[in-house]
Design a protein with these regions (language model features):
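Glycine- and acidic-residue-biased ligand/ion/polar-headgroup-sensing regions
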Residues: 46-57, 62
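Ligand-binding loop in jelly-roll beta-barrel domains
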Residues: 78-103
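Conserved short histidine dyad/triad with adjacent acidic residue
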Residues: 29-43
Length: 106
């Protein structure tokens, strides 16, 4: 799938999401943030890997918080409460989910 052929979804609060590619087992998603934009704490049954493409993020998984920059990554186990704040933007995360997030296609 070509990047510009996928839908850009405005998530509000200074962030957008673009589903890049997927099948039943795997999904890649680009999430862009303005400085101060937040991915509020949440959980889901999917395992997630977040890779920082650009910007700096304060990323929390359960009770552990780390500041991540370009080239850094974090794995979020299914069911873990996690969230992030872009502390230096614009920032972009590449999120990989297994299995795919069907809710992102609705």
């Amino acid at each position: 799938m070509r990047h510009d052929d996928s839908e850009l979804k405005d998530l509000g609060g200074g962030s957008t999401r673009r589903v890049l590619a997927w099948n039943e087992q795997l999904m890649s998603v680009e999430v862009a943030f303005e400085t101060g934009a937040e991915g509020k704490p949440h959980s889901h049954p999917h395992t997630q890997c977040s890779y920082v493409v650009s910007g700096r993020f304060r990323y929390t998984v359960n009770d552990e918080t780390a500041e991540l920059g370009p080239g850094d990554s974090v794995v979020v186990p299914g069911g873990a409460v996690h969230g992030t704040v872009c502390v230096e933007g614009p920032g972009v995360l590449l999120d990989i989910f297994t299995p795919m997030r069907e809710d992102f296609l609705a």
